[in-house]
Each structure stands twice: as C-alpha cells, then as structure tokens.
C-alpha cells in the first residue's frame, strides 16, 4: 500500500496538486506491506524503487495521483494496481455514494479512520512542507492503514456470491487507471496564440448575440429590465408567468403530479406577466438617487437610493399586453424554484414546438439564447479552463476519471473536455497541436459505437444487417423526414438518427421529425423488445447486468398505475453506454497504448468515443498501421476479455492533421 504527500500550487483560482507545476515537490512517501511493515521516506527517497521492484500489486486510494508523482520523480512501476476508490465505485453499481477515503472509512467502520489533525492546516493553506514532519507522518500512516484495511474489506466483498461477478470489471478498471495515468503524464501541447484568437472570435460572437437578444427582449417584454443571464427572468420571457410566492411555489409541485392538478396549481400560484411602459420616477427624476435633507434643512453630502423606484429611476407600469413567448411548461418536471426551467433540453423541445407552429420569432430567440449559453460555456470552461490548466511545459495534462459518471464512462477535469461538442467544427480543437515540429494529431473515432452496441445487446436483426452491410442510416433518416414533408440534409438528420436510443421522443418536434421517431421503434423492433425485457428484469431483480459483468442497481424502481416503469431512460441507456464507453473504449485504449509503447507517439486524450494520439513526424505510417492492427483484432479482443460472442462489426475511423481540428481521413 502506497501514499504520497506533495505540495500544491494556488494558481488561477485553482488548486494544482500535480507534479507538472514548477513549484510543486514531493515531500513524503509512505509504504505499508501486507505484513504491516511500514516505511516512511521523508528527507530522502532512497529505497522507494527497491520497494516498488518487490511489489506484486500497488494499492492506493486514487492511485493515478500516486503513480504520476512516482513516475515524474524518476521512479519506475509498471505492475498491477488496486485502487480502493475505483473498486468501491464499481461495487456501488451505479448507486453513487461519496468515494473519499474518509467517507469509505466511515461507511465500512474501519478500525483506522482518516485523521482530522491536518484539516486546520489545510483550511489555513499551510504548505505541506511547512507542516511539522511528525504530524504529517502520523497523518500519512493513518491514511496507509485505512487504505490497506479498506482494500481487505473490498477484496473480501468481491469474493462473495453477490459481488463476485464484478471481479473482471474491477480488474479492467484498474488496468485502465494505469493507462489514464500515462495519458495524464503525456500532456497535449497547446498553441496559446491560436487559443487567444479563438477567445477573441467567441467574445465577438457573444457580443453580437447579446445585442440581438436584448433587442428581441425589448420587443417581447416592453420596458421591463431583463438580465439575459438570469434563469428566473428568462423564465418570465419564455413562459410569460411569474410565481406569486416562491416558497409556496417550491412546496406545491412534485415531478409526478397529475397533469390536470399541475395546470390548476400553475394558474393559482402564478401571475401572467405583462409588457410594461417605463415612466420616469418623480422622486428622483430618473436618476435613481435622492439627496435627503437634515432637520435643519441642510442636504446630506451623500445621496441615497430612491425607495420609490428601488433605484431604477423609473416605474414600470403594466400594460394590457401579455409579455414574452407565452409557452406552457407541459409537466411538473419543468418546475424550478423561481418559475420554470430554462435548461438546454427543455429549450430544444420548445424550439421544436415553435418550429412546428412556424413561430419564427420564438425560434430565433431560443436559438440565440442557447447559443449565448454555449458561448459562455466555451469561454469559461474551455478557453479559460485551458489557460488556467496549461502547465509551464506548454501542455494541458488531460485528467480522465472513471468514477464520476453513473455508467463508468470517462469524465474529465481541469477542464472537462468531455463536454466538447461533437462533430468536426469546434474551434477550440485547433489550438491542440503536436509537441514535435512536423508532428501530427491523429483522432481514431469509433463509428456509431453505441448504436452498434445496441444492435449487439438487443440482437436486432435489422440493426445488425445495416451495420454489416454499411447501410447509410443518416441518409435514411434524412429521407424519412424529407418524405414526411420537411426537406432535411444528411448532416441535419444526424441529430435525430440515434436520439430515440437515449429516450428522445417525437414530443416537441415538427410533424415530419416526429414521424421519424415513430418510424424508429417500428423499424428496430428488436431494440424495442429488448428495452421491454430490461424493464421487466429491473422490476423483477432490481438490477441490470451487462456482458462485461458490470451491474446497475435500481432500488427505487416502480411500475405506475398506467404500467410505465420509472427510471426507464436510465434502464435503456446504462447498459449501452457502459458496455460501449466504460468497457469497450477503455479496453481498446489499453491495446493502443501497448502497441505504441515502442514508439515516441503517445495517446494524449480520449473524448466521447474517440482516442487522440500525438504522432511523431517519423512515425505517421506506423501509427496508422497500429490503428489498422487494432481494427483487425478488436472483435477477438472483446470476445476474449468478456467471454462472449460479439457478432456486430466495430470500426475505428481515423483522421490526421496539423492540429486536432484540421484533419483528413486516413482510415
């Protein structure tokens, strides 16, 4: 069992705990053998390598952090690992609970608890290397013992009848952890000058979008001041209603409220919003400030906010015209604390309704509102996130996590690149380049992975036939919608092709688009039947088991009076997403890393279903050959790993270029 203590850097409003910060350093390393022989290295680290050489398994809680520090400090370890954090995550079967060492120690009532002695030091931002060494050593010792005790508990749990089926998932998850640590260590080179250009483009577009929205809001709301960044005020604009009493409003609705009762309560608990006319406040003459006078008639030097107009300078007098877009939120699930939700999913639904009814102003407004939200995210999460986390070596060290999502699909941090829009047009991708002059960036992307996995899991004959013959499903989607009366390009049709797999319906779509959603379930009867079997399985057993052995529990599942099963979207999604992106993608990631181990080229990221490689200029054809080898052996590898017969073709499509965006197909 191993744990490290290191200094941290405060930069850009963030804590940086990694070894890539110039001022960060290793302070202490602790090791505990299975014979409870403890060794702490404080001032010198001689002997650490000897322990690593003798280790058969390295146990840690968040082992990636420990591996990075060991590797960056020159130590070598390429053996097996057992990450207690990841093992506990797998054992939770999608029913997520806190995974910190402290939380795990308390949950399993370990004899050794994580010590509180350091919390005051951390709270006061005392540098690790300035904490008294004996106190730090005691803290490290407690962590080592707690981690070892936890590993014993988890290993015993894994060998019980209830959880033994998860052993293969645990083994794969730990193997992947080492690969993700290597990706983290490799880093992805950032062209900072290009990043600044992208930021300028986004800021210019944001200003133009805000200008259009402000003009539209004035038309919709009259003179009522509206903050475009306020979800509450956007709710007024979109739904034309305002809660009378927020506390009462929040306590009135439940997600599964009867539709008739829901509509009745909306009318009773909210008021219609009307357009207003601004009239100058007589008290402050439009200035928003007043100067009070003392009893002796002498005015005060400082002014005060005008109470009559609340400092706005105007009174907003309601007219008889209803303000806003006048949409109705269809169910109680759309309720928020301040009115109604304005999240991306619901705005897309409303946009579909507006398009269906040819409400052009509403379509324009909702399109711009979503774009403004996207631009804010691009600037804060991506541009600023990349700037903050790009290290002195000029690289963004991509941190991929296996324990954040319910399904095991990778999530990202610092920043989360998994939120990157799909497709080959996102400008931020152009800032990522090769570390070598003349080097290239190659992206290997699984073709229709989740659809193909759905075809396999359901054994839908139509889907399997289409995949096997290379049938162009996007062109087919385009044809269905076009034939229904709405000309649609293949590119635009892509947004609809697989949406029904994830629970999307024809609600809020145009009539022609809705036709495709109906057509999907009729066409893929095998997938529809499989969804029904999954629901019955969960009602009967409370859980789903995937071909890899990974499990998902649904302790609160129920069937309502109309026969519908709760959590149905998750029941449909989890098996597909987990087997595709938490099992197959990581397995192939490991294989590609093994194939690249004798080359200079290296994996630098994985986003969605893709794997990104920084390619040395002398190894372009070698890396392309690696992807071809992986393609030819992929099915055999999956069948061997999971002991299954996989009868659906899989393919990594690859493209290469001078940066991550500007690429051309090579496979």
Task: Label each PLM-derived region with a short phrase.
Residues 178, 185, 279-301, 312-315, ...:
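Conserved catalytic core of nucleic-acid polymerases
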Residues 1, 61, 81-85, 434-450, ...:
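Conserved catalytic palm subdomain of right-hand nucleotidyl-transferase polymerases, strongest
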Residues 22-160, 172, 477-482, 488:
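Active-site-proximal helix-loop-helix substrate-binding element of RNase H-like nuclease domains
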Residues 90-94, 182-206, 454, 505-509, ...:
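Catalytic palm subdomain of template-directed nucleic-acid polymerases
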Residues 399-486:
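Function-dense linear segments that define catalytic or interfacial modules
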Residues 148, 197-232, 520-531, 618-667:
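Polymerase palm active-site segment centered on the conserved acidic dipeptide of motif C
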Residues 64-75, 87-92, 234-243, 447-462, ...:
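Short active-site loop/helix that positions an aromatic residue
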Residues 1-14, 21-24, 28-30, 107, ...:
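Conserved "right-hand" nucleotidyltransferase catalytic core of DNA-directed polymerases
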């Amino acid at each position: 069992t191993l744990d490290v203590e290191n200094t941290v850097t405060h930069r850009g409003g963030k804590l940086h705990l990694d070894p890539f910060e110039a001022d960060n350093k290793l302070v202490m390393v602790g090791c505990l053998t299975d014979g409870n022989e403890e060794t702490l290295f404080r001032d010198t680290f001689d002997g650490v390598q000897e322990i690593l050489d003798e280790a058969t398994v390295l146990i840690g809680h968040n082992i990636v952090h420990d591996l990075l520090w060991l590797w960056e400090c020159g130590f070598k370890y390429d053996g097996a690992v057992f990450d207690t954090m990841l093992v506990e995550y797998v054992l939770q079967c999608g029913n997520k609970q806190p995974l910190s060492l402290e939380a795990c120690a308390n949950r399993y009532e370990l004899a050794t608890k994580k010590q509180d002695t350091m919390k005051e030091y951390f709270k006061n931002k005392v540098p690790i290397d300035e904490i008294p060494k004996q106190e730090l050593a005691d803290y490290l010792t407690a962590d080592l013992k707690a981690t070892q005790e936890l590993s014993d508990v988890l290993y015993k749990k894994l060998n019980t009848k209830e959880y033994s089926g998860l052993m293969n998932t645990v083994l794969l998850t730990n193997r992947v952890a080492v690969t993700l640590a290597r990706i983290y260590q490799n880093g992805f080179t950032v062209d900072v000058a290009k990043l600044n250009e992208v930021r300028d483009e986004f800021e210019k577009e944001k200003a133009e979008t805000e200008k259009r929205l402000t003009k539209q809001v004035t038309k919709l709301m009259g003179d009522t001041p509206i903050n475009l960044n306020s979800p509450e005020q956007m709710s007024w604009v979109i739904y034309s209603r305002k809660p009378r009493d927020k506390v009462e409003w929040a306590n009135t609705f439940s997600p599964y409220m009867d539709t008739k009762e829901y509509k009745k309560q909306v009318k009773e608990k909210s008021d219609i919003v009307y357009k207003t006319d601004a009239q100058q406040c007589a008290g402050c003459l439009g200035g928003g400030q007043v100067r009070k006078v003392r009893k002796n008639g002498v005015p005060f030097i400082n002014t005060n906010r005008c109470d009559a107009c609340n400092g706005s300078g105007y009174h907003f007098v309601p007219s008889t015209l209803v303000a806003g877009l006048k949409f109705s939120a269809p169910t109680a699930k759309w309720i928020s604390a301040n009115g109604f939700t304005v999240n991306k999913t619901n705005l897309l639904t409303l946009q579909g309704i507006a398009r269906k009814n040819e409400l052009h102003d509403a379509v324009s407004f909702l399109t711009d509102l979503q774009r403004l939200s996207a631009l804010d995210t691009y600037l804060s999460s991506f541009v600023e996130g990349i700037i903050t986390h790009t290290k002195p070596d000029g690289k963004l060290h991509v941190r991929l996590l296996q324990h954040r999502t319910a399904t095991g699909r990778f999530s990202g941090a610092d920043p989360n690149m998994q939120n990157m829009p799909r497709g080959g047009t996102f400008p931020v991708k152009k800032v990522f380049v090769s570390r070598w002059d003349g080097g290239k960036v190659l992206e290997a992307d699984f073709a229709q992975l989740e659809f193909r996995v759905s075809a396999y899991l359901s054994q839908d004959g139509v889907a399997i036939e289409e995949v096997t013959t290379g049938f162009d499903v996007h062109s087919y989607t385009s044809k269905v919608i076009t034939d229904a009366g709405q000309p649609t390009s293949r590119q635009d049709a892509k947004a609809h092709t697989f949406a029904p797999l994830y629970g999307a319906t024809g609600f809020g779509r145009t009539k022609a688009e809705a036709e495709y959603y109906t057509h999907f379930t009729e066409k893929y009867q095998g997938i529809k039947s499989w969804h029904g079997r999954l629901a019955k399985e969960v009602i009967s057993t409370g859980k789903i088991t995937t071909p890899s052995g990974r499990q998902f529990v649904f302790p609160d599942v129920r069937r309502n009076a109309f026969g519908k099963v709760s959590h149905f979207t998750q029941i449909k999604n989890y098996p597909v997403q987990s087997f595709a992106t938490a099992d197959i993608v990581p397995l192939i990631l490991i294989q590609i890393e093994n194939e690249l181990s004798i080359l200079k080229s290296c994996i630098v990221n994985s986003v969605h279903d893709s794997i990104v490689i920084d390619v040395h200029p002398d190894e372009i054809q070698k890396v392309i050959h690696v992807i071809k080898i992986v393609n030819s052996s992929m099915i055999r590898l999956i069948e061997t790993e999971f002991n299954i017969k996989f009868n659906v073709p899989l393919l990594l499509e690859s493209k290469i270029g001078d940066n991550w965006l500007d690429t051309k197909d090579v496979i």
